[in-house]
């Protein structure tokens, strides 16, 4: 079974370089992803491949989870892949989140996918996540990518890239 699922997709009225400024700076993620409370980098240098940080997120019952994250792929204006471990994942488990951007005329198509293959979640839990996501968000129109689209198209300036 395929354990990667699309959780967000949007056509954003901006060039990929502007969209990338939002996606590539994790300290700005809480502005458009309500599940994220705080990002704490392990180093002051700007984000790049290998950049590591701690992420505090709230998933259910107002309980905060802390996880470690690292950028495993960082292709400017094209693709960002983040590996996250810890939190309420089983020990040794991790997920990959991918933000893929591509230019389409005068817009950017942004797609967010989550790969649960290495999460060490029980089979039925993974199945439930994939099933429910496909049932209620098969188009990818819901979620935090939609929030990012609204911020960009409303003219909110992106967070400053650190470093």
Regions found by a protein language model. Give the residues of each.
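Alpha-helix N-cap/helix-start motif
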Residues: 22, 32, 64, 90-94, ...
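Glycine-rich portal/gate segments that line the openings of hydrophobic small-molecule binding cavities
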Residues: 40-90, 109, 142-163
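Short, surface-exposed coil-to-beta transition loops
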Residues: 5-7, 64-69, 92-97
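Beta-strand/loop substructures that line and gate deep hydrophobic ligand-binding cavities in soluble
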Residues: 84-142, 159-161
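Hydrophobic ligand-binding cavity/cleft-lining segments
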Residues: 1-48, 163
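Generic structural detector for well-ordered beta-strands
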Residues: 9-13, 40, 70, 100, ...
């Amino acid at each position: 079974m395929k354990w990667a699922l699309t959780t967000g997709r949007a056509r954003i009225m901006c060039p990929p370089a502007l969209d990338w400024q939002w996606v590539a700076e994790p300290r700005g993620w809480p502005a458009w992803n309500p599940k994220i409370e705080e990002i704490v980098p392990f180093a002051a240098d700007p984000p790049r491949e290998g950049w590591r940080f701690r992420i505090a997120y709230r998933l259910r019952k107002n309980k905060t989870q802390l996880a470690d994250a690292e950028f495993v792929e960082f292709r400017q204006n094209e693709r960002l892949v983040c590996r996250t471990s810890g939190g309420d994942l089983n020990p040794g488990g991790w997920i990959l989140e991918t933000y893929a951007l591509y230019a389409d005329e005068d817009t950017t198509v942004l797609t967010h996918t989550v790969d649960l293959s290495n999460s060490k979640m029980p089979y039925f839990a993974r199945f439930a996540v994939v099933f429910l996501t496909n049932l209620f968000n098969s188009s990818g129109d819901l979620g935090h990518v939609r929030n990012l689209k609204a911020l960009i198209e409303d003219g909110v300036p992106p967070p400053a890239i650190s470093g």
